């Protein structure tokens, strides 16, 4: 039986999620209660036990309402496929024109493709040497969740958008894992430092030079850094022609299909 989660299901949902995904109780609670909302959590019940779970997080893309399928886990591909069908059908009834997802594994990608999802939101990954430049100035960790939503809207409006409240959960998770946000009037970047390398998981700027200045400012802050690995949207206007293309997300249209060839999706709490 497929249904919405009830408060009494919490212990079973937590145990299933942790067994399948290995996240902390704090992370799971944040995902269920604050990122999706309990009213958007779907479960598959069999013989009085919760066997699968999936979250439907409200999002928008190009001004259209939709949902982000998150946290899909459970036993049995048929059960999971049925849960995906149920979630998508219910979201369509609620007015969603599409459902997006970030597959957690090749098997999940295949399952979603079988359910009508298609690949979208490809990324480009590129290494860059970072020059020393004492004159490159920027601010650090001054961007709020609300501001991050506004910056995404400004620099790449064709982005799968979360509300500021949902983005606050994502930002909290990023900070807990050691992320730093560098920003200026011309752009911003979110990065992790590992040894002598900066890994930018999101970088948006007016042009290549503005992006380079952000990286240079980050290098001055982190001192021993010499290079960066940047991940941007495949269609993003930075360092065009550079980098290796990577698959990332998927989309299923619940209404009239629309063009998502230049659309961007990233930082969807999927690395918890």
Feature annotation, model-predicted:
Residues 74-91, 101, 114, 208-220:
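Conserved acetyl-CoA-binding loop-helix of GNAT-fold acetyltransferases
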Residues 10, 15-61, 155-180:
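Active-site rim helix/loop that mediates acceptor-substrate recognition in acyltransferases
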């Amino acid at each position: 039986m497929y249904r919405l989660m009830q408060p009494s299901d919490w212990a079973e949902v937590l145990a299933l999620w942790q067994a399948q995904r290995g996240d902390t109780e704090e992370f799971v609670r944040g995902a269920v209660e604050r990122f999706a909302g309990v009213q958007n959590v779907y479960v598959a019940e069999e013989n009085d036990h919760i066997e699968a779970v999936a979250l439907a997080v409200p999002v928008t893309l190009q001004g259209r309402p939709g949902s982000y399928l998150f946290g899909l886990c459970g036993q049995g591909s048929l059960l999971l496929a049925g849960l995906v069908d149920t979630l998508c059908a219910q979201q369509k009834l609620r007015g969603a024109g599409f459902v997006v997802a970030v597959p957690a594994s090749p098997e999940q990608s295949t399952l979603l493709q079988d359910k009508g999802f298609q690949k979208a939101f490809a990324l480009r990954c590129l290494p860059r040497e970072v020059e020393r430049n004492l004159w490159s100035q920027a601010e650090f960790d001054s961007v709020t969740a609300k501001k991050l939503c506004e910056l995404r809207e400004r620099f790449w409006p064709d982005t799968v958008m979360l509300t500021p409240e949902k983005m606050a959960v994502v930002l909290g998770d990023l900070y807990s894992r050691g992320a730093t946000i560098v920003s200026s009037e011309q752009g911003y970047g979110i990065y992790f430092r590992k040894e002598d390398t900066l890994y930018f998981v999101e970088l948006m700027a007016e042009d290549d030079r503005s992006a380079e200045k952000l990286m240079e400012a980050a290098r001055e802050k982190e001192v021993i850094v010499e290079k960066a690995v940047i991940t941007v949207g495949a269609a993003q206007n930075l360092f065009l022609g550079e980098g290796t293309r990577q698959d990332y997300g998927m989309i299923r249209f619940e209404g009239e299909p629309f063009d998502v060839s230049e659309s961007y999706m990233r930082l969807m709490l999927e690395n918890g």
